[in-house]
Each structure stands twice: as structure tokens, then as C-alpha cells.
């Protein structure tokens, strides 16, 4: 927690304020620092207190490492300033996207938001197991305040999906990128070209596997269907991992064990890892240095270009919305309470 500044008696404060005009001799109270406006969005203020409320875990870590006077250390102060700058940009984004969600009529209903928040909260809690409560406390969140963070993410995602809904990457775009960047598509190690589908739960993965096995659909059909989901931060995800070596692939062991027995063109049954449930497809085997053909990496290129185009479209829309909403960020105010080296 941020250390509280020394509070001077009110009469003395009056004297000091009078005598120190223009000399910066008065030390602000923590309450005054917290009320400092560090940004405005459409006239709505964001205070330093709001920013610092998201940095409780950082402050606790700094205090543990450097002691109670950690904010007096110029190097630590610089780190905190950078953290504040990052948080205030996030809060600005939340407010801008929240306003635009209402304007565009795309904000999810309260019921939809609650359902998604509860689902994500439980998935995170389940994934972290016994460490969840400690991690929450270490970051300075309660369950309710953490759910507020997730709520903003749900709303933000709805707007992001709207922004990029018409972004397309053609086969011609992919071919052009391949021709201009062939050196990127050379096997770095000997191994198997590997693709996978990643599902949130076992039921979804098993259903997809059964439909592939029955001939109702194909792995490639599902891969095409889901290949843009990663850039939109939602599952199922379809991902081309490129050539995966037999050893030191950097992948989790369960995934590696599921890939090993597969022959070219075969798929695995759903495999559980810490990330969810995977259906893996083994492709051709390539030696180190081999040029990977366009058809084998087209989906990977499309993902690369889609992410680039999505980012460009999102930035362009955000820049315009910030201008329309007269967004202002006061970087100098983010230094309040810190001793920054000049």
C-alpha cells in the first residue's frame, strides 16, 4: 500500500502555503494526491487514486523489497511511474469503449455480462486452484473488484469484435506475404508440421472429435472456421504451430505426448493440458532448413495478417474516438508522490 504522507496541522498548513507559493515546499497529503486528476474522457475524470488502486500488488512487492520508504527511491519511483502510465491508458480505453458500446447499441445485456463474468471468473479460479485466493490478495483485489475488471473486459471485447468484424485477409494477401517473406517459412529444426484446435472444455472437444470421426465435418473445416478466433481472444482456437521438433519444442508435455504417435494426416483424441482440450493434427515431416510450401503455412500467414489488420483497425477507431471524446492524459500528474530523477 502506498505510504501515507505526513499531515501537517491545518493552521500550520495555511502559513506554509502562504509562504511557499511558487516554491513547491508544501507536501500534499495522500488524500489530496489520490484526488489528483490524471486523465479525462468526455469530461469524466480519472484520478490517481483510481490508478493506484490497480497497483496494490506492485506497491506491496516494492515495499517488501525496498522497505517503507520505497517511493523515495528514484529508480523505484521511475518503475511506478511506468506502471501508472500503463494503467491510466487501460482505464482510458475502458471508458472510451464503454461509451462507444452504449452509442453503438452493442453493449451486452446485464444478464449476458453477468453470465460471461461468472464463467470467466470460475475458469480462472479453477485454473489457479489453491493459489487463487492468495494471488487475488497479492494483487490487491477482492472477488468483487476482480469481477469488475472482467466485466470491463467483456464489454471491451464486444466493441473490439464490432470494430474488426469486417476485416478480411484474402488468399492473395497471404500469397504476397509468403513470396516477400519466404525466409520466415523455413524449418528451424527437423520435425512435424503441427496444427491444433483448442477448446474450453472436454465436452466441446469431444463433440468436435466425434463429428470429425463420423465424417460430419473435417479437421480442416473446423480449422478454417476457428482460425480467426485467436486474434479475437476467444475459443475454440485454431493454430498452426509450424514444425515441431521431437525434443525441446517448448510445448507442454501432454501435448508432445499426444503428437508423438500420430502419422501424417492423423488427429489425436482430445488431450487435456493447462490451456484446455486440444485436438492435434500431424502434418508432413521436414528436415531442418527445408522451405515450407505455401499451402502448409497459408493458415499461419492468414493469422499473422489478420492480427496486423485487426490492430491497425482498432488503433484507427480508438484514435478517432479519443479525439471525439476529447481524451486528455496529464502525464506530469502521474508523478505525484514520487521522487523522479531529473
Curated annotation (Swiss-Prot):
One of its GO terms (biological process) is protein folding. Residues 189-284 form the PpiC domain. It is found in: Cell membrane. It is a lipid-anchor. It is an enzyme of class 5 (isomerase). A lipid is attached at residue 23 (S-diacylglycerol cysteine). Disulfide bonds: none annotated. GO terms for molecular function: peptidyl-prolyl cis-trans isomerase activity. Keywords: Cell membrane, Isomerase, Lipoprotein, Membrane, Palmitate, Rotamase, Signal. InterPro entries: Foldase_PrsA, PPIase_dom_sf, PPIase_PpiC, PrsA_foldase, Trigger_fact/SurA_dom_sf. Its main location: membrane. Gene3D superfamilies: 3.10.50.40, Porin chaperone SurA, peptide-binding domain (1.10.4030.10). Residues 1-22 form the signal peptide. It catalyses: [protein]-peptidylproline (omega=180) = [protein]-peptidylproline (omega=0). A lipid is attached at residue 23 (N-palmitoyl cysteine). Its EC number is 5.2.1.8. GO terms for cellular component: plasma membrane. Plays a major role in protein secretion by helping the post-translocational extracellular folding of several secreted proteins. Belongs to the PrsA family. This is Foldase protein PrsA.
Amino acid at each position: 500500500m502506498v505510504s501515507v504522507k505526513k499531515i501537517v496541522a491545518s493552521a500550520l498548513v495555511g502559513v506554509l502555503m502562504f509562504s511557499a507559493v511558487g516554491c513547491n515546499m508544501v507536501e500534499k497529503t495522500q488524500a489530496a494526491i489520490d484526488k489528483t486528476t490524471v486523465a479525462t474522457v468526455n469530461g469524466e475524470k480519472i484520478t490517481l487514486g483510481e490508478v493506484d488502486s490497480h497497483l496494490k500488488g506492485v506497491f506491496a512487492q516494492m515495499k517488501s523489497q525496498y522497505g517503507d520508504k520505497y517511493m523515495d527511491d528514484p529508480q523505484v519511483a521511475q518503475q511506478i511511474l511506468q506502471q501508472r502510465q500503463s494503467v491510466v491508458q487501460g482505464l482510458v480505453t475502458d471508458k472510451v469503449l464503454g461509451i462507444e458500446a452504449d452509442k453503438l447499441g452493442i453493449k451486452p445485456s446485464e444478464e449476458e455480462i453477468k453470465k460471461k463474468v461468472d464463467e470467466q471468473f470460475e475458469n480462472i479460479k479453477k485454473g489457479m486452484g489453491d493459489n487463487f485466493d492468495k494471488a487475488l490478495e497479492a494483487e490487491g483485489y477482492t472477488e468483487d473488484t476482480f469481477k469488475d475488471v472482467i466485466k470491463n473486459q467483456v464489454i471491451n471485447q464486444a466493441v473490439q469484435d464490432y470494430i474488426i468484424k469486417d476485416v478480411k485477409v484474402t488468399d492473395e494477401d497471404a500469397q504476397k506475404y509468403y513470396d516477400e517473406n519466404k525466409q520466415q517459412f523455413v524449418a528451424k529444426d527437423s520435425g512435424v508440421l503441427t496444427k491444433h484446435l483448442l477448446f474450453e472444455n472436454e465436452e466441446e472437444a469431444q463433440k468436435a472429435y466425434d463429428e470429425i470421426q463420423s465424417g460430419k465435418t473435417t479437421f480442416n473445416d473446423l480449422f478454417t472456421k476457428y482460425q480467426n478466433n485467436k486474434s479475437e481472444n476467444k475459443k475454440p482456437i485454431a493454430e498452426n504451430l509450424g514444425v515441431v521438433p521431437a525434443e525441446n519444442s517448448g510445448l507442454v508435455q501432454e501435448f508432445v505426448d499426444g503428437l508423438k504417435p500420430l502419422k501424417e494426416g492423423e488427429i489425436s483424441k482430445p488431450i487435456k493440458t493447462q490451456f484446455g482440450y486440444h485436438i492435434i493434427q500431424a502434418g508432413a515431416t521436414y528436415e531442418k532448413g527445408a522451405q515450407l510450401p505455401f499451402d502448409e503455412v497459408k493458415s499461419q500467414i492468414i493469422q499473422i495478417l489478420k492480427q496486423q489488420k485487426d490492430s491497425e483497425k482498432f488503433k484507427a477507431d480508438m484514435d478517432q474516438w479519443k479525439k471525439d471524446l476529447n481524451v486528455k492524459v496529464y502525464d506530469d500528474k502521474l508523478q505525484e508522490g514520487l521522487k523522479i530523477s531529473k
